[in-house]
Amino acid sequence: MSEKESPSPQHKKDEVVDDTEQETKDSEDDATKKMKIKEGSKFTMNSILSPLESLARVQQQLLKMAAAQSGFGGNGSGGNGANGFPYPARFATNCFSGPFPGYNGSQNWYNGNDARFAAAAALLPCAIDPVRSAINHQFSMSQRRKRRVLFSQAQVYELERRFKQAKYLTAPEREQLANSIRLTPTQVKIWFQNHRYKCKRQEKEKAMSGLGHGDDGCSPPPGDDDDDDDKYSIEMDDKDDEEEDGAKPMLKSNGVFGLPYPSPANAAAAAAAAAFNFQFGAQGPNPAYFMRW
């Protein structure tokens, strides 16, 4: 029976070398795959730090060149400090006078052709210019405000004639009058409000001057060139809606709770009547009054 041949030391050494080379190749393949995965992703540390690193290298080169040209050490040549770094330049602005390829050449940095910057630039003048925005706001406010409509002479004549007949119109009467003179019911309604206000103001002025009241047509005094009746004003409040839809309103007194202000004679008469009613009353003498005695 023949004995198995034992492997020689050289053969064992070759096998160990082959295993080591295979492991090295496997590790290199794994590292290459990882680097490809990292380079393919957009948000890796290399993709973020690569522009900064290139910028730092460019700045360092510029600093070295400036220190070599205008440094403090040697005969005009750049010297090194205690830590081995070059001395700073005399004029720091020379270091940053040239363009930075990290910003211009790299695609990772945004440039002016980006669509988002174009949209922001389109909105920027209106946002930072207060004068222009104020003018635009003023124009929009003036455009939204309604203009006053001028009435024709025939329309004013018909409105005044109807106002002499009745100072308050119901909704059907207002609509009928508006259709006859080619106006809207709202214009007729506000014209009546303005005309009533004008009549009250003129009556108050006449009462203060002692001239008395005018006629029902509220004719203006001589020299009064007020043209409020010839205009449709939207600034008046829409009051007297219920009064126009119903009958003529009752005159309002100036007293508290709708009562007139008491005079001394009226106060004495009211006190005497109250005392008499307490003593006797409507049904006879009041027992509570006589129980006091």
From Swiss-Prot:
Family annotation (InterPro entries): HD, HD_metazoa, Homeobox_CS, Homeobox_NK-like, Homeodomain-like_sf
GO MF annotations, alphabetized: DNA-binding transcription factor activity, RNA polymerase II-specific; RNA polymerase II cis-regulatory region sequence-specific DNA binding
Sections of the chain in a coiled coil: none
Keyword field: Developmental protein, DNA-binding, Homeobox, Neurogenesis, Nucleus, Transcription, Transcription regulation
Similarity remark: Belongs to the NK-2 homeobox family.
PANTHER family named in the record: HOMEOBOX PROTEIN NKX, MUSCLE-SPECIFIC HOMEOBOX PROTEIN TINMAN-RELATED
Its job: Probable transcriptional regulator that is required in neural development for the normal formation of sublateral cholinergic motor neuron processes. Plays a role in regulating the expression of acetylcholine transporter protein unc-17 in the sublateral processes. In particular, it is required in sublateral motor neurons for a left-right turning behavior that occurs during the lethargus phase of the normal sleep process called 'flipping'. During 'flipping' animals rotate 180 degrees about their longitudinal axis.
Official protein name in the record: Homeobox protein ceh-24
Provenance organism: Caenorhabditis briggsae
Gene that this sequence comes from: ceh-24
